[in-house]
């Protein structure tokens, strides 16, 4: 009979359902008995303000906040947070850390994906240089049960990126965010025209998640959890 391992939860520090949909399948395949939960699943409602000037800083900020919130509730868990930015060369790397809040909107009005896409295309009007890249940084903070009964502390980051071009108009109905106007390098389709599995196999977030999953897997192996 296989030994029963302590319950371990990976808490996705996001309220973005689209991100959860992309992250969950990769993390659920890590090991048996690993539970992947979003903040909504745990009945938590927190919005961490992204005040850091880098993707790394914002990802750590969110992972730290979720760790403090979850620590009294769960014995063994990993808080996993990400921050993603679109870096457009012709715009000096903008929108970067401001990607989610790029378009100017009136106070009190909710900013939409479409607002950001329209603003980006407006800023890119007439520009021949359309190279860009998506970058995702994932921060992990948590604790796992060591074989000797103590705790293994986790605190680190992984990252992933993909180069591509900004199209002149939106194409495709899939994905989210800037996906309709980002064509990965070497492809004549945008992220929004790819299936979710095809996108995850090459995307910045997919690459960062794979790197994070590898590190988590190494920690689990260290703790004797398969």
From Swiss-Prot:
Mg(2+) binds at residues 49, 83. CDD domains: HAM1 (cd00515). The active site is at residue 83. Keywords: Hydrolase, Magnesium, Metal-binding, Nucleotide metabolism, Nucleotide-binding. GO terms for molecular function: dITP diphosphatase activity; ITP diphosphatase activity; metal ion binding; nucleotide binding; ribonucleoside triphosphate phosphatase activity; XTP diphosphatase activity. SUPFAM superfamilies: ITPase-like. Substrate binds at residues 14-19, 84, 176-179, 199, 204-205. Binds 1 Mg(2+) ion per subunit. It catalyses: XTP + H2O = XMP + diphosphate + H(+); dITP + H2O = dIMP + diphosphate + H(+); ITP + H2O = IMP + diphosphate + H(+). The keyword Metal-binding applies. One of its GO terms (cellular component) is cytosol. Its cofactor is Mg(2+). InterPro entries: dITP/XTP_pyrophosphatase (IPR020922), ITPase-like_fam (IPR029001), RdgB/HAM1 (IPR002637). Signal peptide: none annotated. NCBIfam families: PRK14826.1 (NF011401), RdgB/HAM1 family non-canonical purine NTP pyrophosphatase (TIGR00042). Homodimer. This is dITP/XTP pyrophosphatase. It comes from Chlorobaculum tepidum (strain ATCC 49652 / DSM 12025 / NBRC 103806 / TLS).
């Amino acid at each position: 009979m296989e030994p029963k391992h302590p319950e371990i939860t990976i808490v996705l520090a996001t309220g973005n359902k689209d991100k959860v949909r992309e992250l969950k399948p990769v993390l659920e395949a890590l090991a048996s008995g690993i539970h992947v939960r979003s903040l909504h699943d745990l009945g938590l409602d927190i919005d961490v303000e992204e005040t850091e000037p880098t993707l790394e800083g914002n990802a750590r900020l969110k992972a730290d906040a979720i760790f403090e919130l979850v620590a009294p509730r769960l014995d063994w868990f990993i808080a996993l947070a990400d921050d993603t930015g679109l870096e457009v060369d012709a715009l000096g790397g903008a929108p970067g850390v401001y990607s989610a809040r790029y378009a100017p909107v009136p106070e009190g009005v909710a900013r939409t994906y479409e607002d950001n896409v329209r603003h980006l295309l407006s800023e890119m009007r007439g520009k021949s240089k359309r190279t860009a890249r998506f970058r995702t940084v994932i921060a992990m903070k948590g604790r796992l049960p060591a074989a000797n009964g103590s705790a293994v502390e986790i605190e680190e980051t992984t990252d992933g990126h993909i180069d591509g071009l900004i199209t002149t108009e939106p194409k495709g109905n899939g994905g989210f965010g800037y996906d309709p106007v980002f064509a990965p390098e070497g492809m004549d389709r945008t992220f929004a025209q790819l299936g979710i599995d095809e996108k995850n196999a090459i995307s910045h977030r997919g690459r960062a998640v794979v790197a994070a999953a590898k590190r988590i897997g190494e920690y689990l192996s260290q703790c004797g959890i398969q």
